[in-house]
Amino acid sequence: LIKNGCIYISSAQIFGFDGNFYKKTNTSKPNYQFVLDSLSSKDKNKKSNLKLSINSLIIRHGAIRYDIYDAPYTSSHFNLKHIKLNDISAHIIIPYYTQDSTYISVKKLSFKESSGLDLRKLSFDFSFNKKCTKLHNFNLSLPNSKIESESLSLVYKTINGKIDNKTIAYSGAININRINFSDLKCFLPRIKHNITPLSLKATFTGAYNNINIESFNLHSIDKGLVFIGNVKLKKDKNGFIWNANIRKIESSAEWIAHTIKEINPSIKLPDFINSIGKIYYTGNTNGHDKYISINGNLKTDIGNILVKLSKNVNDIYVN
């Protein structure tokens, strides 16, 4: 329904669609170019008046294929030049969409990709306007992994319709309940399946020239690795200034050696590594430009080390 210049769709259901999109070469036009041309304004300086509202869009058993024919195939690796999606299912609501403001609610999106990627569920609420962009209720589920974020927000000012980068401020929180590397094999083909899954929680704030990771908590599911700390990073005219407080790194030489072997079996570690036993470190590291300072306390089963190290340009100082 088109009313008062707005395209309003109360409900739409699409079942069993099969889309085939391609480019003959990387530089040639795609086979859907005529659609893009029909939607684009002839006057490049004219503001789009498109207004769209979809109360409910349901997709079931869809498939999409995209190829650039002169690009090589990689059957077990995810390849943006050869994408093949199957079993696409989605429920999407778009209360409003205009050039100046948008609200999109993805209740569910799932699909399988030929490289092995299996997206079980993606859901989120996304909005933007001339003052802010927000991502709420983000949930991503793979067969053995789950990532969540209650809120990611970006505020800014606009000048002549464009975001003024120097006014940007952002904040957010990420909760990776579990990330299993077997789910990412299509992106990281060399990594083996039996690397211990990891969990991560982090909160952060920042602006145009700085970021403050207020809390960072990384640990393996088997507790073989625990990393807790916070980081501040700022950029000025002379380069980057950074400070990292490491509240705790806890692991063992055995766990580290096993993980390195799973990542790259060709790396051979010295036999004495296992005798180090448990590892515990706490400390601080900071720097600016070419200066680095490390201060900390390293404890192991074979002894303790008080670490005081600094580097300025090409000179290294050990206390």
Language-model-detected regions and their locations in the chain:
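Amphipathic hydrophobic-ligand
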Residues: 1, 8-9, 71-90, 114-125, ...
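Short, intrinsically disordered, charge-balanced linker/junction segments flanking boundaries
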Residues: 1-2, 290-292, 313-319
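Secondary-structure transition motifs
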Residues: 1-101, 117-119, 145-157, 165-169, ...
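Transmembrane beta-strands of outer-membrane beta-barrel proteins
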Residues: 13, 136-138, 173-175, 214-217, ...
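Transmembrane beta-strands of outer-membrane beta-barrel pores
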Residues: 16, 63, 108-110, 142, ...
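Solvent-exposed beta-strand/coil patches in large extracellular/periplasmic or lumenal scaffold regions
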Residues: 35-73, 88-112, 121-122, 134-138, ...
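Long amphipathic alpha-helical scaffold regions
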Residues: 148-177, 231-258, 312-319
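Long, compositionally biased, intrinsically disordered segments
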Residues: 172-174, 184, 193, 198
